[in-house]
Each structure stands twice: as C-alpha cells, then as structure tokens.
C-alpha cells in the first residue's frame, strides 16, 4: 500500500456512509442518544465514526483487516518491523515495553528521570530498577540524557539486566548518542527500550536527533498525539525483531488495552501517519524555522535565555530538538511558575510546563507566525514588568537535590502496609506511593525511596 492511503480512516468513512442501523454499543447511536448540546458541539461526522470492533471494522486486539493495514503502513513509515497502535496513550506503550522484557525480580536499567509509567510497569512486573543518573544542567536546573559512561558502567555491573530504557529526546529536547548506546547494550544482548514520547517528528527530518528505529533500538513508545497531529491519548509502539518476542509484546499491549477501543483515536493515528510520511519533512522544516526565529527573538530580550546549539558537546547533549523552546526566567528574579501564571493572566497564553527556573513552549506543525509573534511580545512585556527585580539583584538560586536511593523495591513498598504522616515528618521514612507534578509526570518521590531532611526541603 502507498503512504498516501489511509485504510482505517477511509473504511470508517465508508461504513458511516452506508448508515447501518446500529443495535450495538456505543449507546448514543451516532449521537442521537446523547445530550444535544454536546452533540452539536462535537458534530455528526465525529459521532458517526465513534464505533467499536464489529466484524466489518476489524479488531485492535487481533487485527487482520483495515487496522492491520494501517499498522503495517505505520511500521513502514517509522522503519519498524511491527507497529502497534495504542489508545492507552504512550504510557500504555511504555508499560508494554517494560512488561514485555521483565518479570518478577528481573533487573532493568533506567534513568532516574523516567516517566511515572515506567515505574508503574516496574511495580506491576515486579522488576528491579537499576537507576542510571542523568546529566544535570546546573544553569537551567534540568536533567539531560544519560551519558555513555553511565551506560557502560551500568552494563558492566549488571550484565544480567533484561532491558535498558532510554529517553530520546528528553522533555526539554536534548538527546544522547542513542546509536552508540544501542550498540553497547546489544553487545550484551540486552534490548533497548526507548521512551520517544516527545520525538514522533524526529524520524522525519535529518536535522533532528536520530529516532529510536534509526538508531537500531528494539522498541520505542512514540507519542503521535503530542507532536504528530493525532488526537490526545493516541500513540504507537514500534518494534524491531531480534531481541524481543513480538508475539509476547502483542499479548502484553492487548492485556493493557480496553476492549472498547476508540475508532476515532485509531483513525487519527492513521491520518497523522499519512501526513508525517508524505509531507513531514517539509512541514517540520517550517516548524524548525519558526522555532529558531522565536529562539533568536527571546535571546535578544534582556534577562531571558533560550538555550540552543551552544548546549551541545557532552555525552548527554549529543543533539537537540530546536522546536522545544526553553525559556530561563531565573535572571528576572522570578520562578517559572510565576511566569506561567503571568502569561496566562496577561496574555491568555498557556505553556507546556513550568518549573522553578524555566517555562517550556512547544512549537509544532499547528503553530503560526501570528501565534509565535504573540509569544515573543508577551515575553518582552514579561521581561519589562519584572526588570526591576533583576536590576535589584533578586536571584532565584538553582538547587538540585540528590537522587534518592531505594530502600525497598518499588513493588514491595507499594504493596506494603502504609500510614499517612505529615510531609515534614517524612525524613528517614520509606515512600509508599508516587508524588509528582504533571507535566512532565516524572516522579519526585518513588515507592521504595528513602528520603532525608535536605532532600525533603529541596523538593518542598
């Protein structure tokens, strides 16, 4: 089939045109059985393809027809041997990767700055995480990728690990030398699992970091909805044969997936793949140019800083994605959280993320020059508004806490008897649940972690 075809979406449209009389779920029956206000807002076409896995429409759990064709086209587009559609988000795809290679007691090498879904899968599988410390940027106060040296050390000390998980690129857009990491892991016959939640587009442009499949990784959870144009909660899992059992992967993702599959989400993956495969390079080039214009404009504003190519040169910052706009506001004497609230209240601008020192804005295929000009004007106003704080020497100090050490396995801690105590009394106690801020969904506290007074003060 051609990458210009959309077998899943096209079949859904043809099915809706036949207008069959439905005596199956969903009970709203093309919108007729739901609140009219919502029906009018969503629209007839969307509700007409809100369908389930009846015989003419294939079955995500055992695809043989239009879903299989759509997944095969996605595999070809991303350079995978197999692609599985996920309507459980990239979290579901990440959990599938971990649970496909790990069982109770198995070791898995992971960066400490992994997403909650990785730790959730570790709890479900009973695996033992071996943390690799990411490189920390003392100027921005953010985590980058893992270094080649940390990977070498982890592999030498834990050559019996069942998998190595890598984030590529990070939430902030930085990438390590993934190809070399893959080669290292494969020399130990250890499969490489890639959290590619923020990198669906990198496969389709040569100036962006190397994608997981291009680097030879074994599995990659790739979030099409975040940056690739599909609907929220839709994602894909790309798999290469060899070190992983594809049938087992399919069984795990089926186990984690609802049987009431959303065909709207599946169709959005089909059409997003078509656009990326056929127009992606040109569209992403426009997006990069737009982002670089924004970066240059921000760096001309006093007391603001937007990192770019000058950050490259370490093992953990081998390459970067310029469409991620990090704006460091600490030299204004304010926090990223304050900047986020100010932009919302003054300019009706919503950013992707804020932390103590930065805000993060994503430039995607959906942005326009008008939108980015508004952002630039807003940041100029922000800098002017808080310039007095900067001139007075008010500074936000970057303080990076130590990475906690596990006292128990995450699974043992999670399923242990627990008690709720005041936060200030938690020093020396073992955490039983996740504590995190979303976005990005990286656990601050992880089940099994032992926390001390200084760590608690910094995290608070």
From Swiss-Prot:
SUPFAM superfamilies recorded: PLP-dependent transferases (SSF53383)
Pathway note: Amine and polyamine biosynthesis; agmatine biosynthesis; agmatine from L-arginine: step 1/1
The highest taxon in the source lineage is Bacteria
Q: Name one GO molecular function term.
A: arginine decarboxylase activity
As its record notes, the protein acts as a catalyst of: L-arginine + H(+) = agmatine + CO2
Query: Would you tell me the Gene Ontology cellular component terms?
Result: cytoplasm
Could you confirm whether the keyword Cytoplasm appears in this record? Answer: yes
Q: What does this protein do?
A: Catalyzes the formation of agmatine from arginine.
Alphabetical UniProt keywords = Cytoplasm, Decarboxylase, Lyase, Polyamine biosynthesis, Putrescine biosynthesis, Pyridoxal phosphate, Spermidine biosynthesis
The UniProt entry, under PANTHER family, shows: ARGININE DECARBOXYLASE
Underlying gene: speA
- Residues recorded with modification N6-(pyridoxal phosphate)lysine: 226
Look at the named UniProt entry and state the broad enzyme category this protein falls under.
Answer: lyase
Q: What is its main location?
A: cytoplasm
The record's EC number reads 4.1.1.19
Give the similarity note: Belongs to the Orn/Lys/Arg decarboxylase class-I family.
Question: Which cofactor(s) are needed, names only?
Answer: pyridoxal 5'-phosphate
Protein name according to UniProt: Arginine decarboxylase
Query: What Pfam families does this protein's entry cite?
Result: OKR_DC_1, OKR_DC_1_C
- Cellular localization per UniProt: Cytoplasm
Gene Ontology terms describing biological process: putrescine biosynthetic process; spermidine biosynthetic process
């Amino acid at each position: 089939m051609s990458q210009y075809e959309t077998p899943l979406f096209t079949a859904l449209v043809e099915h809706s045109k036949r207008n069959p009389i439905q005596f199956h779920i969903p009970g709203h029956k093309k919108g007729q059985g739901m609140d009219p206000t919502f029906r009018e807002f969503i629209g007839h076409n969307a509700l007409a393809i809100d369908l389930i896995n009846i015989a003419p429409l294939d079955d995500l759990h055992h695809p043989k027809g239009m879903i299989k064709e759509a997944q095969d086209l996605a595999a070809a587009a991303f350079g995978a041997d197999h692609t599985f559609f996920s309507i459980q988000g990239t979290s579901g795809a990440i959990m599938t990767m971990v649970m496909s290679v790990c069982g109770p007691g198995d070791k898995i090498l992971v960066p400490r700055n992994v997403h909650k879904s990785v730790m959730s899968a570790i709890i479900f599988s009973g695996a033992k995480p071996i943390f690799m410390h990411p490189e920390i940027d003392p100027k921005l106060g953010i985590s980058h990728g893992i270094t080649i040296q940390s990977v070498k050390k982890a592999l030498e000390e834990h050559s019996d690990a069942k998998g190595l998980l890598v984030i590529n690129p990070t939430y902030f857009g930085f990438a390590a030398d993934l190809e070399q990491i893959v080669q290292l892991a494969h020399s130990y016959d250890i499969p490489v699992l890639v959290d590619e939640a923020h990198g669906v587009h990198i496969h389709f442009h040569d100036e962006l970091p190397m994608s997981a499949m291009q680097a030879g990784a074994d599995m990659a959870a790739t979030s099409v909805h975040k940056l690739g144009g599909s609907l929220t909660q839709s994602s894909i899992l790309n798999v290469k044969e060899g070190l992983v059992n594809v049938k087992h992967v399919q069984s795990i993702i089926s186990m984690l997936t609802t049987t009431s599959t959303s065909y709207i989400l599946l169709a959005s993956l089909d059409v997003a793949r078509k656009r990326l495969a056929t127009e992606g390079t040109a569209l992403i080039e426009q997006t990069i140019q737009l982002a670089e214009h924004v970066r240059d404009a921000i760096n001309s504003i006093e007391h603001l800083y937007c990192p770019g190519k000058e950050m490259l040169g370490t093992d953990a910052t081998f390459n970067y994605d310029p469409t991620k706009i990090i704006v460091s506001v600490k030299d204004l004497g304010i926090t990223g959280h304050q900047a986020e609230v100010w932009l919302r209240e003054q300019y009706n601008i919503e950013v992707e993320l804020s932390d103590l020192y930065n805000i993060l804005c994503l430039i995607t295929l959906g942005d326009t020059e008008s939108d980015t000009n508004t952002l630039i004007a807003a940041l100029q106003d922000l800098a002017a508004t808080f310039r007095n704080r900067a001139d007075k020497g008010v500074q936000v100090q970057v303080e990076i806490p130590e990475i906690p050490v596990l006292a128990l396995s995450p699974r043992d801690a999670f399923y242990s008897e627990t008690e709720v105590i005041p936060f200030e009394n938690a020093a020396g106690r073992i955490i039983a649940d996740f504590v995190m801020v979303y976005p990005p969904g990286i656990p601050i506290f992880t089940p099994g972690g032992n926390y001390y007074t200084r760590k608690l003060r910094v995290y608070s």
